[in-house]
Amino acid sequence: MRALLLFLLAWSPLSQESRLEVFVTCRAPELFSDFGNDNFRQVVHAVPGGLRVDLKSRTLRLRGLNHRFAVDAAALAAQPEAVRQACAQAGQGALSLSDYLRGISLFLRNRVAYDEADLPQGAAEVLAQGKGHCIGYANVAQALLACVGVASRPVNGFFLREARGRVEPVPHRWLEVFLPGGRRIFFDPQYQDFSSRYLVANAGFPPESVERFEGVVVSRSKKILDE
C-alpha cells in the first residue's frame, strides 16, 4: 500500500511534504552540516549531548520532470555492454527524464536483488551478478543517467530506520541528480523514492567509518501540497 501511495503521488499534481525532527547522540558533530536542494533540507543544531536535526523533504514528483530525453551516443559508447543493454531496457518507451527515471526504478526492482555480501559494486558487476547493496544500486543508476547526458553524484549519509520512536542511522548511499536550470534533486535507487528519513554526511566522512550512534524522534508532520 505504501509503495502504491508513493507511486500515485509521484505522478499526480500533488506532492507530500514531510518533516522529521530527530535528536542523535553522534560523537562526531563535524560529520553533519546544513544542506538543501530542490526536494530536501537538513538543518543541524548542536545541543548538549548530541545534535538536533530538522529534516524536510518533498515527494519526488516524476510527473514534473518533463525534461527532454535523449541518449548521449558518446557516453553510451563508453559504457560496458551490460550498461548499454540496461539503458535500452530502462529507456524503452521513454519520452522524458521522468519516464526514464521510472524505467530505472522498475529495472532495478526487477533485475537487482539487495544483498549485503561483500561483492563487487561496479555498475557492470552488479548487473552481471544480479545483486548488490546501496553502493551498487547507486552506481548502476548513475551509469544509466550518464547514458542520457544527465549528471549525478553519489551522496553518503544515513537512512533513519525507525522503531517505537527511536531511530537507528544505517550507513547508506544515494544520488543527487543535476537537472536543467540548476535544479538538484535527491533520488534513492534502492528505496525508489526520497523522504525525510535521511541524514546527509559531509564529503570526506565515509559513514561506515563512524562510530555507531542512535537517536529519538522529537516531532514529525506531513502535509499534501497542490502544485
Model-derived regions: residue spans:
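Sec-dependent signal peptide recognition
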Residues: 1-6
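Intrinsically disordered, low-complexity N-terminal segments that are enriched in acidic
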Residues: 9-61
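Short intrinsically disordered coil segments
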Residues: 36-39, 66-73, 189-192
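Generic structural motif
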Residues: 39-46, 152-154, 209-227
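N-terminal accessory/assembly segment that mediates macromolecular interactions
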Residues: 53-75
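Secondary-structure boundary elements
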Residues: 67-132, 140, 207, 217-227
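Hydrophobic/aromatic-rich core segments of domains that either
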Residues: 139-215
